[in-house]
Design a protein with these regions (language model features):
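Alpha-helical sensor/transducer elements of the RecA-like P-loop NTPase core
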Residues: 83, 175-241, 245, 252-255, ...
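Extended alpha-helical scaffolding segments used for macromolecular assembly and cargo binding
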Residues: 40, 54-58, 330-331, 347-350, ...
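Helix-coil-helix junctions within alpha-helical repeat/solenoid scaffolds
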Residues: 337, 342-343, 422, 456, ...
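Conserved Walker-type P-loop NTP-binding/catalytic site
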Residues: 2-3, 83-150, 208, 223, ...
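Internal alpha-solenoid helical repeat scaffolds
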Residues: 63-64, 98, 202, 243, ...
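P-loop NTPase Walker A phosphate-binding motif
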Residues: 46-79, 83-86
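Conserved adenine-nucleotide phosphate-binding loops and their immediately adjacent elements
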Residues: 1-27, 110-123, 276, 280-283, ...
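Short secondary-structure boundary elements
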Residues: 221-229, 233-426, 430-433, 545
Length: 886
């Protein structure tokens, strides 16, 4: 890597950098002394301010003591996914064979390997967040193997998005790793996501010690450097003019002094007037004029190098310009002498990024486009991938070339396979501009919509709608496009529109597999839509459709799952719910093509399957399903929204089983993962609702309210169904806080919603139990009616949990022996239920009501085992103090 002050005064750009050099020395010393935690140095500042020189000092101080790996962003390669992280790890990766690489990376080999270029990608699109996590894990392993290790990244403002995403995640892990990370970037150059990632890195550094903004030289430092370079005879007026001309910019100062020395100028006041003109030759139009003065061959060679940007060899640059070997060598020599290029013939680079930028911008538009086109073909001819050629194809002017469209589509598939959907999106957008042939235009739009699904649901909607408005999609592809469009609409909160979109497409198809798939998706979105117009009619039609189905294919299995979920939410017989779910499985397992990572069917369908088992007291099957989801998503590197949802439902299975501490852990992790994906997403509602419910069971009201505040848990609610019922959970929170009037309003609203949708499952949505207790003091008749209705619905559903909870609710409205008798029956049911927390609640209440210390002690033991702290404390206090007996 070239240094800014190469061939000048080696320490020139390091004047007035004592604080930064001290931080470098201390950080390297700390690493070598074996500190368990990592270090981070971030240097920022304008172009030419000396950041690269400081990074060079890191290498000098570490020489002979540490392993140092370096990488550098490039202005012309920002579109190349994982360019910087591959460059950074190249010393470790280049020597690894496939077997060694697999051993080094372990379980992350299949996920991180393709992104690093050391493993072949699989055939499917991978989750970008999973790839980032895989890279963090992979680099963490390499850190342990190569300690003491220093990672140096220069010009991070030009790093590709994928590498920056990794860098931000890795910087947040440094407290756990013995590695020194050193990053340099310009102030204000990065925008959008790049700026956000660099801000994350900056936040991980400590201002004043490991985060430093470099400033320009003072006049005194400029004078000192001038005399060190040109001799003590440099007079004060000359030194002041050097500072005035360069503004104290270290790079410009060093370059200007080198030119003064090369020109043989006397550093005295009489020659100072020539400094401004001399300085202009090193930048902007002056640099271009200098380049043109070297001749046509040297100019074209510099243009080619600027277009290539990285991995520049004299042979490749000459090939792009059509120069012979001797002419190319002569041009390279001239460019080195003019301090434009540096390095050997196999590793040419520009002396400074400012020069590279100026040269690239000086290339006439037509010539630049032609050079990018030639570079793309050169990359392709060399046997490298379409993805590698794509950065050049992106710069070629559209010209109705079907071959370029095909290359860009291949590149997009390669980008998706390594976890770079943004890069794939850029390729397909450019392919669309070519434009494609009429017969493939709709397909390119479809591919563009699919590429945007994980990163831009709005883009997915626009592109898929455009694709569906055109001819050219195969029938199966068209059906898939409609399903993906509806999924994007749901993720954007437009559930009603998703339902209508599916319905219109299904109506135009003849009976067959595609139509049945659309029907299933239609009912799936209706099933989670809280604002559907005629829920009773939908349930009736779904019941009729599902009745004769045996589960012979995945469309039938999907309809059986939807029917089971509908029956569960409406509180129909739980045995029927379980029987329908079982019919949707193949030998007790998910059918091929209907797995957690299969794309034909949305994973929401499997959430419905697991949720149906969960609320029908078949926690064993729900746990197996969601644990499988968690395992598969982790193995596959799907660590975005899918993994967040899996953690949420694994956590809620623990909640239903009464493992409240474990449940809280999973649910907090779910929210952490969801926060990485975005804000106020449907997954946040589910996970927050489940966590608040769990914390209420534990008796941690303050923590529950913290979650409610952080995730804005309250009205207005989203238009999709939340599991468990959000209004019931919020009503319970309000009651626990003594905010009875607000709780009644919330629970009355839940009552109206249930009446509109005919969803009466007292386990999923126990609003009747809660409302009965809330209104009992002022309206005991209404409370009794609510409790009686809840009991009838619970007996209709038929699970031990539902009936036991209904009996416990009824007991809360009674006194004396009647209450004790009802609690005894509740305990009998809940003892047979898999829900240990509800059993503990009933057992404690029964022990207190019956004044039975043995029963209360059993309740205390159960409460402790569940992690229900407040319930356990209540039982313990009654046993210890003898107060509070029924």
């Amino acid at each position: 890597m070239a240094r800014e002050n190469a061939q000048a005064v080696p320490s020139g750009a390091l004047w007035e950098r004592d604080a930064e050099l001290a931080a470098v020395s201390a950080a390297v010393d700390g690493l070598c002394e074996g500190h368990d935690t990592g270090g981070l140095l971030v240097f920022t500042g304008e172009a030419g301010i000396g950041k690269t020189a400081v990074l060079g000092e890191v290498e000098r101080v570490a020489a002979g003591r540490c392993t140092v790996w370096t990488a550098r962003g490039g202005e012309t390669v920002t579109s190349v996914p994982f360019h910087v992280v591959r460059q950074l790890l190249q010393p470790a990766l280049v020597s690894l064979g496939p077997v060694e690489a697999r051993e080094y990376l372990g379980d992350w080999y299949e996920i991180a390997g393709p992104a690093l270029g050391i493993a072949q990608p699989g055939g499917r699109q991978v989750d970008p967040q999973g790839v980032v996590d895989g890279l963090v894990a992979a680099v963490s392993r390499l850190v342990m193997l190569h300690w003491p290790l220093i990672l140096v990244i220069d010009d991070a403002h030009w790093a590709d998005q994928e590498s920056l995403r990794w860098l931000a995640a890795f910087a947040e892990r440094l407290d756990d790793l013995p590695v020194l990370l050193v990053v340099a970037h310009r102030d204000g150059e990065a925008t959008g996501d790049s700026a956000r990632h660099l801000e994350t890195v900056g936040r991980a550094a400590r201002p004043g010690t490991s985060l430093a903004t470099l400033t320009a030289f003072t006049p005194a430092a400029t004078a000192g450097l001038t005399r060190a370079t040109l001799g003590e005879g440099a007079d004060d007026p000359f030194c002041r003019e050097v500072w005035a001309v360069t503004g104290g910019n270290p790079y410009e100062t060093v370059e200007l002094l080198a030119k003064v020395r090369a020109a043989g100028m006397e550093p005295v006041e009489s020659t100072a007037g020539a400094l401004r003109e001399l300085n202009a030759k090193a930048r902007g139009r002056g640099l271009v004029a200098t380049l043109e003065g070297l001749g046509t061959d040297a100019t074209k060679l510099a243009w080619s190098a600027a277009v290539l940007g990285t991995n520049i060899t004299l042979r490749l640059a000459a090939e792009l310009t059509g120069l012979g070997t001797e002419d190319a060598a002569h041009g390279a020599r001239l460019l080195r002498e003019a301090r434009i290029l540096t390095g050997g013939d196999d590793a040419l680079e520009f002396v400074h990024p400012l020069i590279a930028t100026a040269v690239y911008q000086s290339v006439p538009a037509a010539a630049r486009t032609a050079l990018h086109g030639q570079a793309a073909w050169a990359v392709t001819r060399s046997g490298r991938s379409a993805a590698e050629a794509s950065r050049h194809l992106l710069e070629v002017h559209p010209d109705d070339d079907p071959e370029i469209v095909d290359q860009l589509r291949r590149a997009a598939r390669e980008h998706l396979a390594v976890g770079a959907p943004e890069a794939a999106y850029r390729c397909l957008e450019r392919a669309l501009a070519e434009p494609p042939l009429p017969e493939t235009h709709a397909t390119v739009l479809y591919e563009l919509g699919c590429a945007a699904l994980l990163t831009s649901p709005n883009g997915t909607v626009a592109h898929l709608r455009a694709a569906l408005a055109m001819d050219g999609l195969e029938p199966g592809t068209r059906t898939d496009a409609v399903c993906r469009l509806s999924q994007a609409l749901v993720h954007l909160g437009h559930v009603s529109e998703a339902v209508q979109t599916i319905g219109r497409e299904a109506a135009r198809l003849e009976p067959g597999p595609d139509r049945m798939r659309l029907q299933a998706v239609h009912y799936m979105w209706e099933g989670i839509h809280t604002g559907e117009a005629d829920a009773l009619e939908r349930s009736r039609v779904l019941r009729e459709i599902a009745q004769p189905l045996t589960g012979r294919d995945n469309s039938e299995r999907a309809l059986l799952i939807l029917r089971a979920f509908d029956a569960m939410t409406r509180g129909e017989n739980a045995e029927l719910v379980v029987e329908l779910c079982d019919r949707a499985l193949v030998n007790g397992r998910l059918a091929p093509g209907l797995g957690w990572t299969d794309t034909e069917w949305s994973f929401e369908l499997l959430i419905m399957l697991g949720g149906s088992y969960l609320f029908a007291d078949r926690l064993d099957r729900a746990e197996a399903l969601f644990a499988e989801a968690l395992r598969i998503y982790e193995i596959s590197g799907w660590s975005g929204g899918h993994l967040a949802i899996a953690h949420a439902f694994v956590g809620y299975v623990h909640r239903r089983r009464g493992r409240l501490v474990e449940a809280e852990g999973y649910l907090r992790e779910s929210l952490r993962l969801a926060d990485r994906v975005g804000e106020e997403l449907p997954m946040h509602w589910d996970a927050a609702c489940m966590l608040i419910d769990t914390l209420l069971c534990r008796g941690h009201l303050g923590r529950a309210q913290e979650i409610a505040d952080r995730y804005h848990f309250g009205p207005p609610y989203p238009s999709i169904l939340i599991l468990p019922d959000a209004q019931s959970v919020r009503g319970r929170l309000l009651l626990a806080q003594g905010r009875t009037k607000e709780a009644i309003d919330e629970l009355e609203s839940a009552s109206h919603a249930a009446a509109e949708t005919d969803r009466y499952n007292t386990v999923l949505a126990p609003w009747q139990h809660l409302l009965a207790r809330a209104v009992a003091p002022r309206d005991p008749r209404r409370a009794a009616e609510l409790a009686a209705d809840a009991r009838r619905q619970a007996e209709r559903f038929g699970t031990d949990t539902a009936i036991g909870e209904a009996l416990r609710c009824a007991a809360a409205l009674e006194t004396g022996q009647r209450a004790t008798s009802l609690l005894a029956r509740a305990v009998a049911y809940l003892e047979s239920s898999p829900c240990a927390y509800e059993h503990a609640e009933a057992r404690v209440a029964y022990g207190i009501a019956a004044r039975d210390a043995g029963e209360l002690t059993r309740g205390l033991t159960l409460a402790r085992a569940c992690g229900a702290d407040t319930l356990a404390a209540r039982a313990r206090d009654v046993l210890r103090e003898g107060r509070g007996w029924g």
